[in-house]
Regions:
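Globin-like tetrapyrrole-binding proteins
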Residues: 1-153
Length: 153
């Protein structure tokens, strides 16, 4: 459960995310691929090159910021992303890598607006959202046992 204070802070960042979302997500991928090159093979690099992946992620992050207190409104988005994650063998252990990269990108792009309070709220909000995805993806893997990724990844 997300605290009301966190909800209020996240919602207050929505205008900045709308304005700078693409810049944040582009920066996130730069950070993530630099620090974790092994993860790159799971991504469609043509979608990286044309910016469509960054745009989709920016839209998803903005949607989460505006609907953080109404997660059922995000169900169709979560379903679509979770199924894509299953297709590309995303594992629970990769969520902290993405989270660390996203939070650093927010700091880099938002500068002084990324206060300790804002970053703490986004850390909490990301952890909650990653649990939603991890649980949903687990259920999808359970239904499709033949699609389970190798444990060693």
């Amino acid at each position: 459960v997300i605290s009301q204070q966190t909800i209020d802070i996240i919602k207050s960042t929505a205008p900045s995310l709308k304005k700078h979302g693409q810049q944040i997500t582009t920066r996130m991928y730069e950070i993530m691929f630099r620090n974790h090159p092994e993860i790159k093979e799971q991504f469609d690099m043509s979608a990286q090159a044309d910016g469509s992946q960054s745009t989709r992620l920016a839209t998803a992050v903005y949607s989460y910021a505006t609907q953080i207190d109404n997660l059922p409104a995000l169900k169709s988005m979560v379903e679509k992303i979770a199924h894509r994650h299953v297709q590309t063998d995303v594992l629970p252990a990769q969520y902290p890598i993405v989270g660390e990269s996203l939070l650093q990108a927010m700091k880099d792009v938002l500068g002084k607006a990324a206060t300790e309070e804002v970053m703490s709220a986004w850390t909490e909000a990301y952890e909650v959202l990653s649990e939603v995805f991890i649980n949903r993806e687990h259920d999808i893997y359970e239904v499709n046992l033949d699609k389970m990724p190798p444990i060693s990844k």
